Regions:
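Short, conserved acidic/polar surface loops in the N-terminal third of protein domains
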Residues: 70-72, 114-119, 176-177
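Short, well-ordered loop/turn elements at secondary-structure boundaries
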Residues: 99-100, 118-120, 158-162
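Two-metal-ion RNase H-like nuclease active-site motif
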Residues: 102-112
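Short glycine/serine/threonine-biased micro-segments
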Residues: 110, 123, 164
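RNase H-like nuclease fold core
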Residues: 114-132, 136-142
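Conserved DEDDh/DEDDy metal-dependent 3′-5′ exonuclease domain
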Residues: 131-193
Length: 193
């Protein structure tokens, strides 16, 4: 019998698998670590809770001076982009009046890629020019009841924005955010941008 047990242990080790007892021990250890708060975002990332104790999202704010370089280009150089060049490169005549200083740059991380009413944007990154800096704000839902205060905050960021810049926002990010705003009975300002 011990020969069979030794073979099983060897096979488990070779495949990187755990025995039932090891699995149970690791699961209990992980549960204790979670209960201690070790994995709470505020212990890993500098930021603040916005809202109240019952429903407040986690916000990380970062400012980048306009002389911050990305490759060979500084952030400030984006403000020099000619609208007609932007429209031509995007093959979109509607961008002939594009002004980076009034745009909001968005990206979302979601609970799934299917879209629809069950998909939630648990992390929304929003960047915008503000005087001599480019501000990046990352709003993170720690739980589902954080969504409404996070959307209210984002609504304030969207106010006064003339354009939205995203990677795949027209087909994913914007429809997803629109759905979340509607489900929370809030107007979606980006439809006008």
């Amino acid at each position: 019998m011990s020969e069979l047990r030794d073979k099983l242990q060897s096979l488990l080790a070779r495949q990187g698998l755990m025995s039932g007892a090891e699995w149970r021990r690791k699961t209990e250890e992980l549960a204790q670590r979670r209960a201690s708060g070790e994995f709470e975002i505020d212990r890993v990332v500098s930021g603040e809770v916005v809202g109240d104790a019952n429903a407040g999202f986690f916000l990380v704010r970062t400012e980048f001076p306009l002389d911050t370089a990305h490759g060979n280009v500084t952030l400030g150089e984006a403000l020099l982009a000619l609208p007609e060049h932007v429209a031509l490169s995007a093959n979109d005549a509607d961008l002939r009046d594009f002004a980076p200083e009034t745009a909001i740059f968005l990206d979302t991380e979601t609970t799934g890629l299917a879209g629809g009413s069950g998909t939630v944007a648990f992390l929304v990154g929003a960047g915008y020019f503000d005087g001599a800096v480019f501000r990046l704000e990352q709003a993170f839902m720690r739980d589902f009841d954080d969504e409404e205060p996070m959307l209210r905050y984002l609504d304030g960021l969207f106010t006064g924005r003339d354009a939205v810049v995203t990677y795949n926002g027209k087909s994913f990010d914007i429809p997803l955010l629109r759905t979340r705003f509607i489900q929370n009975r809030m107007p979606f300002r980006l439809d006008a941008a």
